């Protein structure tokens, strides 16, 4: 076997060797052959072919026709390549998705609060009810909770609220509140079981059954009645000699004063509709609260007074037309509480005051209607002159060295320790008010002007009801129960709140200690008397204007005033209707501005000087300091006020509900029952119509309601269900007026029904005026009255404070009172715990008061991300400005992320800050596509240098952050250096009204000035001339809108807001349009139009390039006619050339333009050639509309019932045949297409706030673009004449001369300390 195997192995090896050697041999042979082939090809074949080619000859022959044909073919190829490769770059622009509108609906997870049952959320119900008290410190809350008790009331039982001396809260169930009608009314309500009562309202879970008036009565119950049975100026000496004992009665006019009226007890009962559980806080709880916490009690009373005024008074006056009831309070106060100065003071001093006032007026030669009389030093000339006369006459030069201890004439009061203070440190019954002061016997120290001021202050306090008295003894007995609840007395049980409050942490207790601020400053009456200003008003001067916030009390020293209360129904559209005028005369000793100053609210009356008048002005700040020193004085003032309130307002107080809403909280939903009307007291609401059944919520329409607006009257009267969903945009306060209240008041006071009818009529008129917008897409209606504005940075920036300062200064120049709120200012006013859990109530009350005092509040979010102040800014804003530097990274910043997380539905607007007045193409879209929730955007030029950066102490760190951010975003800054378009001169605003901040301020104030340009072909050149004339007159524009050629001109102006580049670009475009050869070469087979549209497209694209509409410096829109959906579309984003071309697309001349979604768009003039209605919906108050459309003949025609085209053609050439007017086919089609536009254009001429202009260019044809200079001059001359007419009629005063607030009432003067 071994031998055989070896033999086999040897054979195999030999075969392998053989195959290997064979393969190698064959490979070598192949390589050799290929090498020989290459060598042969290179040395023989190639030279041979080269020789043949060089020596080969070819002859080609062409005739002239062939050469001409080849030439034209070559030309066509070149034209086609250039046409479709280089000249239509506009068709190859990158597709830009349309920017979607921001979602303005509420969070779908937020719904109206469901009724709560039983005691599951009893503490929440209690907290909700006592929220009418405002901010409560925790010890005060514990004191109230300690006395609360519950009671079960069976169905049908009644409680007499008019006689109830407890605070009642409905925990579970429902009460019906009834009132007794007037004696002269025979109408009854049978459902109450008591035929003499009418239903006012229904009160259900969580709502207080007691009214504001009841709460004030509980706090002031122990305050004794302020009577004037005795003369307050009795037993004073008749001479000025110190120590004299001879007495006389001064001020004889005050000898017999009427008693103050007792507080009205309204006949109001509450009937349990079902078995109901109530919570009761008895009267003694409030009495103990007054003794233990006088400062907090005064604060609660002030909050209740303000809300009583803001809810009850304001609703009754502005909405229900109860001006007579409101006016009676001021009238009764002056008729019952007038305290004149003593005769020995009024005799000579007043004459000297008048002489000094007249001499000062003549010396100043001023046109001012008031003069603030000021002392010339510590010892005034007037006082020394008066004292020296009286002293020399009576006593010669004798002066006693003994300090005076008896009453002297001129002191008005008995002596007291000069170092006595107004407030001691003890807390208990009200101490006697130390209105007394003593003077030195030396003549140099005796200042009768100080005694005069003391007398004024005393008269003011006596008018307010502040006399020398002490509190009554507190009655600790519980208030008696009414008959209907006697059987349920066993169910009265105590509620344990202490367990809830014991859970408060040590930190919360520390917050309580720090939140109770007790003033330690002890001031004498002299220090407060120095605050009084002596002001002389000339006859006819308006001292108090209706709607102004109270800044102090006016005491009439001499002269007469007229107080008037115009009955006005003010609508949100600034439509006022005068319904009458109430008036009375205020005599010396009377008080002006009482109601507004006591409640710290705005005035309801106008007060003018009937004659030259001398008044003493006590600032509101001084009164507040006095109340801080002696808190219980506020209870006395409140008791005097509630004694003057008529019974009608008391009934209104029980029926009108006060509601506080959080952001995004829904008031009612669509299809809910309509049983009440809501009036916005503070905040902002939005109503929307949506489709809940669909997969996504489709917002079809919305409207916004600000302060003073009402919602729901039409549905309530028609007994229809709610047609929309209403929700709160931010923290809001509403007054709820039930339908039952309207029914009750309409029977006894028919004026209420008339008032409501006027509201409905005005609302229907607005709906009819808005019908012109039904054919377009549903667009949001901007509300004009922005009361609160939040400025939030996109990321950390040092321009936040500078931006807010510039905006505030412009708003102030426009006549608006503005308050800027920063975190530091709020903390300084409210303390370090202002943003704590309990401090939010105090913060909310503080912000509400500021909103009542100022026209606009600006919240500057200058805190860190996620801070409580940032959340407050967002929650309180009607509109949010997101501040960003345009040359930075457009990604969403950290502040914006926090804003998105809060899901705020307030309108958010992006403000892009540019160092130059220029925006590169496409830059704005980079910012907007990342922020679909942005509603609008603004371009603002804000230059900042190193001086501005380091102007504040804390700017060093900010400056470093700016440097770091600029380095990180450096590649964005290179855009302006490499873009050739930036090399053109940049426009600079030279006038104040042309600045970007003035434009923002006008938008905020609802005074935006808009420009609407109509279509008309070449006649639109005249619009440029009119614009030049308007700009010469100083008229700025904030929003631009246009149709057809108006869209072209408007786009050019909105691009850079400068007429110089606009003029050049427009003239260049008209030159292209005047070249008819361009359109001849563009003619094609008339499938969709007679031309391809290329030359038209290229002419517009050569003008605008790749710029987007959102890159325009001014807001701009163009309208088109969407023939796919038969509607009018508004375009405010996308490529400018594309939508301007769509707005200029005449049917038949150029094909329709396609939108991004494939819709066919034609000239917007077919639907509305002058879009004034849409411009009004954007918030413009003044609109300049320029109409250059063709005027069709309105002459009647008489061509018969049939028309022969042949006879019409022949009749033109036969002279002896009577000429008959025949319409052409083109004219008929043109009139047909413009039917809708003509109808809307006629309405424009009569719209309020619209300045309609129609230059005389009807003789120029539509395509007469070659007459540029001629048409331009016609427009310019017409514009000059129109502006002169407006100036002559003073219609441009508000636009050209914004109201300046530098000359205002003397209560705003800074130097008050030197007034006499």
UniProtKB/Swiss-Prot annotation:
Superkingdom, natural source: Eukaryota
Signal peptide: none
UniProt-annotated binding residues for a nucleoside 3',5'-cyclic phosphate 2: 640-763
Catalytic residues (positions): 1044, 1163
Classification via Pfam families: cNMP_binding (PF00027), NTE_Ploop (PF24179), Patatin (PF01734)
Places the protein is found: Endoplasmic reticulum membrane
Family annotation (PANTHER family): NEUROPATHY TARGET ESTERASE SWS, NEUROPATHY TARGET ESTERASE/SWISS CHEESE D.MELANOGASTER
Protein name: Lysophospholipase NTE1
């Amino acid at each position: 076997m071994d031998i055989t195997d070896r033999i086999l192995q040897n054979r195999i090896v030999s075969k392998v060797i053989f195959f290997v050697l064979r393969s190698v041999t064959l490979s070598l042979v192949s390589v050799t052959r290929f090498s020989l082939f290459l060598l042969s090809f290179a040395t023989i074949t190639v030279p041979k072919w080269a020789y043949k080619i060089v020596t080969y000859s070819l002859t080609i022959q062409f005739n002239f026709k062939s050469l001409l044909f080849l030439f034209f073919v070559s030309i066509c190829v070149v034209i086609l390549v250039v046409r479709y490769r280089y000249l239509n770059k506009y068709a190859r622009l990158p597709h830009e998705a349309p920017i979607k509108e921001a979602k303005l609906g509420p969070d779908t997870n937020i719904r109206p609060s469901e009724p709560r049952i039983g005691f599951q959320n009893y503490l929440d119900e209690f907290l909700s009810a006592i929220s009418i008290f405002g901010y409560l410190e925790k010890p005060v809350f514990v004191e109230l909770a300690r006395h609360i008790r519950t009671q079960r009331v069976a169905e049908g039982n009644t409680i007499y609220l008019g006689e109830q001396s407890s605070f009642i809260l409905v925990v579970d169930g429902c009460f019906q509140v009834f009132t007794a009608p007037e004696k002269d009314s025979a109408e009854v309500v049978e459902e109450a079981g008591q035929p003499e009562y009418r239903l006012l309202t229904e009160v259900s879970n969580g709502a207080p059954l007691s009214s504001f008036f009841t709460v004030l009565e509980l706090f002031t119950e122990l305050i004794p009645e302020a009577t004037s049975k005795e003369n307050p100026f009795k037993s004073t000496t008749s001479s000025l000699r110190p120590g004299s004992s001879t007495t006389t009665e001064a001020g004889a006019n005050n000898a017999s004063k009427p008693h103050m009226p007792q507080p009205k007890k309204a006949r109001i009962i509450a009937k349990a509709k079902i078995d109901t559980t109530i919570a009761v806080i008895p009267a003694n709880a409030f009495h103990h609260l007054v003794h233990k916490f006088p400062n907090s009690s005064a604060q609660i009373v002030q909050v209740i007074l303000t809300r009583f005024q803001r809810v009850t008074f304001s609703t009754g006056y502005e909405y229900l037309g109860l001006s007579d009831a409101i006016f009676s309070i001021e009238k009764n106060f002056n008729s019952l509480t007038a305290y004149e100065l003593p005769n020995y003071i009024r005799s000579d001093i007043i004459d000297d005051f008048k002489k000094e006032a007249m001499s000062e007026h003549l010396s100043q030669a001023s046109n001012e209607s008031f003069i603030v009389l000021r002392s010339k030093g510590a010892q005034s000339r007037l006082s020394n002159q008066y004292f020296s006369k009286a002293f020399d006459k009576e006593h010669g030069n004798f002066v006693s060295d003994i300090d005076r201890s008896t009453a002297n004439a001129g002191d008005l009061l008995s002596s007291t320790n000069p170092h006595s203070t107004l407030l001691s440190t003890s807390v208990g019954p009200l101490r006697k008010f130390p209105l007394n002061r003593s003077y030195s016997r030396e003549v140099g120290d005796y200042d009768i002007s100080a005694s005069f001021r003391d007398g004024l202050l005393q008269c003011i306090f006596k008018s307010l009801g502040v006399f020398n008295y002490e509190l009554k003894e507190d009655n600790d007995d519980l208030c008696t129960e009414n008959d209907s609840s006697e059987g349920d007395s066993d169910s009265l049980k105590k509620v344990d709140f202490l367990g809830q409050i014991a859970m408060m942490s040590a930190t919360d207790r520390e917050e309580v200690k720090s939140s109770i601020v007790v003033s330690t400053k002890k001031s004498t009456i002299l220090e407060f008397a120095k605050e009084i200003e002596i002001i002389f008003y000339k006859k006819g001067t308006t001292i108090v204007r209706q709607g102004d916030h109270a800044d102090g009390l006016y005491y009439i020293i001499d002269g007469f005033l007229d107080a008037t209360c115009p009955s006005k129904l003010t609508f949100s559209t600034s439509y006022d209707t005068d319904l009458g005028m109430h008036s009375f005369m205020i005599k010396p000793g009377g008080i002006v501005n009482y109601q507004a100053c006591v409640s710290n609210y705005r005035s309801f009356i106008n007060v003018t000087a009937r004659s030259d008048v001398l008044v003493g002005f006590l600032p509101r700040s001084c009164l507040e300091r006095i109340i801080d020193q002696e808190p219980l004085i506020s209870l006395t003032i409140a008791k005097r006020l509630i004694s003057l309130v008529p019974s009608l307002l008391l009934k209104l107080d029980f029926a009108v509900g006060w509601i506080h809403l959080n952001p995004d909280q829904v008031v009612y939903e669509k299809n809910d029952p309509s049983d009440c009307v809501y009036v916005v007291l503070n905040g902002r609401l939005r109503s929307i119509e949506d489709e809940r059944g669909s997969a996504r919520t489709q917002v079809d329409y919305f409207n916004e309601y600000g302060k003073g607006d009402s919602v729901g009257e039409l549905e309530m009267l028609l007994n229809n269900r709610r047609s929309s969903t209403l929700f709160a945009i931010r923290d809001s306060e509403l007054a709820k007026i039930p339908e039952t209240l309207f029914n009750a008041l309409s029977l006894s006071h028919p004026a209420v029904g008339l008032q409501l009818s006027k509201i409905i009529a005005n609302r229907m008129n607005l709906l009819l005026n808005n019908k012109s917008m039904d054919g377009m897409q549903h667009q949001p209606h901007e509300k004009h009255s922005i009361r609160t504005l939040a400025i939030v940075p996109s990321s950390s920036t040092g321009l936040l404070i500078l931006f807010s300062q510039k905006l505030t200064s412009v708003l102030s120049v426009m006549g608006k009172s503005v308050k800027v709120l920063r975190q530091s200012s709020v903390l300084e006013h409210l303390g370090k715990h202002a943003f704590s859990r309990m401090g939010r109530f105090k913060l909310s009350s503080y912000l509400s008061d500021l909103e009542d005092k100022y026209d606009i509040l600006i919240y500057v979010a200058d805190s860190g991300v996620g801070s409580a102040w940032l959340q407050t800014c967002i929650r309180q804003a009607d509109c949010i400005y997101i501040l960003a530097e345009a040359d930075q990274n457009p990604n969403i910043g950290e502040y914006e992320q926090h804003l998105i997380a809060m899901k705020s539905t307030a309108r958010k607007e992006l403000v892009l800050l540019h160092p130059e007045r220029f925006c590169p193409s496409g830059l704005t879209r980079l910012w907007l596509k990342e922020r679909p929730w942005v509603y609008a955007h603004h371009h603002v030029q804000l230059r900042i240098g190193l001086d501005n950066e380091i102007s504040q102490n804390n700017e060093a760190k900010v400056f470093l952050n700016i440097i770091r951010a600029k380095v990180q975003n450096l590649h964005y800054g290179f855009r302006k250096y490499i873009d050739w378009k930036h090399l053109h001169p940049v426009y600079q605003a030279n006038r104040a009204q042309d600045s970007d901040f003035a434009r923002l301020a006008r938008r905020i104030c609802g005074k935006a000035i808009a420009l609407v340009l109509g279509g008309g072909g070449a006649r639109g050149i005249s619009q440029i001339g009119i614009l030049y004339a308007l700009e010469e007159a100083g008229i700025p524009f904030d929003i631009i809108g246009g149709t057809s050629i108006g869209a072209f001109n408007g786009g050019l102006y909105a691009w850079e807001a400068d007429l110089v580049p606009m003029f050049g670009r427009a003239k260049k475009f008209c030159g292209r349009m005047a070249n008819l050869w361009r359109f001849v070469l563009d003619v094609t087979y008339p499938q969709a139009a007679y031309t391809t549209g290329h030359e038209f497209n290229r002419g517009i694209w050569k003008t605008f390039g790749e710029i987007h509409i959102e890159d325009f410096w001014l807001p701009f829109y163009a309208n088109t006619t969407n023939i796919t959906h038969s509607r009018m579309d508004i375009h405010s984003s996308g490529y400018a050339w594309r939508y301007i071309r769509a707005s200029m697309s005449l049917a038949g001349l150029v094909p329709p333009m396609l939108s991004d979604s494939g819709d066919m768009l034609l000239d917007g003039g077919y639907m509305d050639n002058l879009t004034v209605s849409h411009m009004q919906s954007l918030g413009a108050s003044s609109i300049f509309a320029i109409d250059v459309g063709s005027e069709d003949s309105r002459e009647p025609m008489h061509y018969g019932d049939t028309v022969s085209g042949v006879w019409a053609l022949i009749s033109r050439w036969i002279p002896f045949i009577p000429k008959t007017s025949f319409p052409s086919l083109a004219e008929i089609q043109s009139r047909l297409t413009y039917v809708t536009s003509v109808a809307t254009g006629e309405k424009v001429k009569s719209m309020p706030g619209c300045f309609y202009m129609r230059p005389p260019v009807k003789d120029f044809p539509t395509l007469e673009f070659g007459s540029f200079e001629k048409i331009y001059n016609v427009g310019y001359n017409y514009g000059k004449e129109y502006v002169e007419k407006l100036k002559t009629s003073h219609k441009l005063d508000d636009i050209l001369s914004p109201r300046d607030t530098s000359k205002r009432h003397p209560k705003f003067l800074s130097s008050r300390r030197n007034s006499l």
